């Protein structure tokens, strides 16, 4: 059944210039522009929103858990450009054509809500956070002062307070921002400001060579942040990891001492709780001991692994996180709050964030307002306009409760454990290692390679398998799964369970489909 208006009649939204002109005689013109009444057809606009919402409901929401739908309908870029009609013209298009464009966008977009989308560290559909997104898009708020965003500022404060509690701090501060990469940049800049407050006004001149330490398995945003902030990528010291991808504390101690002997100024250690590929958790207590001994700021990038704090069973993975000075935590990942929903949390409660980032814009942050201006939190952010991302997490948390969020984490990790055991049973599948979290890394070895000795030729051929299977699954639309080479290991698959819509049957299908797509290689 078509969701588009009947094209035989005059479609909604097709407004003639005559219809736009007010019927009254006393038309007011300024620079040739009619100022009487609104310049848009409100009724037609409302009808377009109604039709578009129905399209979203029927084509996205209702099909989100349908395994008979394709995960993606792959088209190469040049073909997709033609199908979407991307050209922007002088004249606008009628609403029936815009709805067709919307339908095309849905059709050719990757269905990240699909139960068989395993490509990234986000997936699935949380209905409550989706409603929250609809609301905030319609209200179009910007979160910087209480006067323009009273509800969302209070919501953000409540969510941050609860997240701080789960980290184990008695009090703290924080801000929601556009991504874990930005959180890591916040941490790097804040640690530098704490080390040398004068840098805010005087800049980098006169400072010693600043150096920071992070895991060799850290997120690539650490290099980007160092470049962006003028610290320099050469001053990011990547500390060796063990075979499971965890930072080795003894190596960290050694590198800090070496840097000091060279005359550099160590100021920050970034540990990782849940690395992107292997899902490794650095030993936080041992790292915190080193930071305390040398007076270094400890930041924990828990963008991926922070959600384990919600689980009484799995929070042990982040043992020692309460000793961190700052934490990055992304509820849009395993807690499914919708991209993007990312918190930067700070143990300090002395307004360090505000002192570091404030610019005291007089048109926003007047101190003689008629209400308590401590609720005007926008000067803690590097942004001015800022989305109310905390609301998505808040509404989902209100709906599910802490116990519901805990169950979400526990179920995801239980399904991951099921997949691990199935991989061990199946011929042609080989685990990289026993997983610590939800990242299941494995090779698929096609029949043609199963009798080969594991020498250079074997690994060279196996390196080609995962990309070829990925191409086949994308073009078929049956599945999406990530792969990568890593630390000297040839291409392997990384599977991550997040969505509660995923079932045991989907785990079985994953392995069956990989075998089906790759057995002739």
Curated annotation (Swiss-Prot):
It catalyses: L-aspartate + H(+) = beta-alanine + CO2; 3-sulfino-L-alanine + H(+) = hypotaurine + CO2; L-cysteate + H(+) = taurine + CO2. One of its GO terms (cellular component) is cytoplasm. Its cofactor is pyridoxal 5'-phosphate. It comes from the Eukaryota. Keywords: Decarboxylase, Lyase, Pyridoxal phosphate. Expressed at highest levels in skeletal muscles. Also detected heart, spleen and rumen. Residues 1-12 have a biased composition (Basic and acidic residues). Residues 1-20 are annotated as: Disordered. InterPro entries: PyrdxlP-dep_de-COase (IPR002129), PyrdxlP-dep_Trfase (IPR015424), PyrdxlP-dep_Trfase_major (IPR015421), Pyridoxal-P_BS (IPR021115). Its EC number is 4.1.1.11, 4.1.1.29. One of its GO terms (biological process) is carboxylic acid metabolic process. Homodimer. Belongs to the group II decarboxylase family. PANTHER family: ACIDIC AMINO ACID DECARBOXYLASE GADL1, GLUTAMATE DECARBOXYLASE-RELATED. Catalyzes the decarboxylation of L-aspartate, 3-sulfino-L-alanine (cysteine sulfinic acid), and L-cysteate to beta-alanine, hypotaurine and taurine, respectively. The preferred substrate is L-aspartate. Does not exhibit any decarboxylation activity toward glutamate. This is Acidic amino acid decarboxylase GADL1. It comes from Bos taurus. The lineage of its organism: Eukaryota, Metazoa, Chordata, Craniata, Vertebrata.
């Amino acid at each position: 059944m078509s969701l588009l208006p009947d094209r035989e009649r005059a479609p909604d939204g097709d407004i003639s210039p005559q219809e736009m002109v007010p019927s009254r005689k006393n038309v007011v013109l300024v620079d040739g522009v009619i100022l009487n009444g609104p310049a848009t057809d409100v009724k037609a606009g409302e009808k377009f929103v109604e039709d578009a919402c129905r399209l979203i409901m029927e084509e996205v929401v209702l099909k989100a858990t349908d395994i008979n739908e394709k995960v993606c309908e792959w088209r190469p870029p040049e073909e997709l450009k033609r199908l979407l009609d991307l050209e922007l013209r002088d004249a606008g298009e009628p609403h029936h054509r815009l709805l067709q464009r919307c339908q095309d966008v849905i059709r050719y977009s990757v269905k990240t809500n699909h139960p068989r989308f395993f490509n990234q560290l986000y997936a699935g559909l949380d209905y409550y956070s989706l409603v929250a997104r609809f609301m905030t898009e319609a209200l179009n708020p910007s979160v910087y002062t209480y006067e323009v965003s009273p509800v969302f500022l209070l919501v953000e404060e409540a969510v941050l307070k609860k997240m701080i509690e789960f980290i184990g701090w008695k009090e703290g501060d924080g801000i929601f921002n556009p991504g874990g990469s930005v959180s890591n940049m916040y941490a790097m800049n804040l640690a530098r400001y704490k080390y040398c407050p004068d840098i805010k006004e005087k800049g980098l001149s006169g400072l010693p060579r600043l150096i920071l330490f992070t895991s060799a398995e850290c997120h690539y945003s650490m290099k980007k942040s160092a470049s962006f902030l003028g610290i320099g990528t050469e001053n990011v010291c990547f500390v060796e990891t063990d075979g499971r991808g965890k930072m080795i504390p003894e190596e960290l101690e050694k590198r800090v001492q070496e840097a000091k002997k060279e005359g550099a100024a160590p100021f920050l250690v970034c540990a990782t709780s849940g690395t992107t590929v292997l899902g490794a958790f650095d030993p936080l207590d041992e790292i915190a001991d080193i930071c305390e001994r040398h007076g270094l700021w400890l930041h924990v990038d828990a963008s991926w692994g922070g959600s384990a704090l919600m689980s009484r069973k799995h929070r042990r993975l982040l043992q020692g996180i309460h000793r961190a000075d700052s934490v990055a935590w992304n509820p849009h990942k395993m807690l499914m709050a919708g991209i993007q929903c990312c918190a930067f949390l700070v143990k300090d409660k002395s307004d360090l964030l505000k002192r570091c980032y404030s610019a005291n814009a007089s048109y926003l942050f007047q101190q003689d307002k008629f209400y308590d201006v401590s609720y005007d939190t926008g000067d803690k952010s590097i942004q001015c306009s800022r989305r109310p991302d905390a609301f998505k997490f808040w509404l989902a948390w209100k709906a599910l409760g802490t116990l519901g969020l805990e169950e979400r984490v526990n179920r995801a990790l239980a399904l991951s454990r099921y997949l691990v055991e199935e991989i061990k049973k199946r011929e042609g599948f080989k685990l990289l290692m026993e997983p610590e979290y939800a990242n299941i890394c494995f090779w698929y070895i096609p029949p043609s390679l199963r009798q080969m000795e594991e020498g250079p030729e074997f690994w060279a051929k196996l390196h080609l398998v995962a990309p070829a299977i990925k191409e086949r699954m994308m073009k078929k639309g049956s599945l999406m799964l990530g792969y990568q080479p890593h630390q000297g290991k040839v291409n392997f698959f990384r599977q991550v369970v997040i969505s509660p819509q995923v079932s045991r049957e989907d785990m079985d299908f994953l392995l069956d489909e990989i075998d089906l797509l790759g057995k002739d290689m």
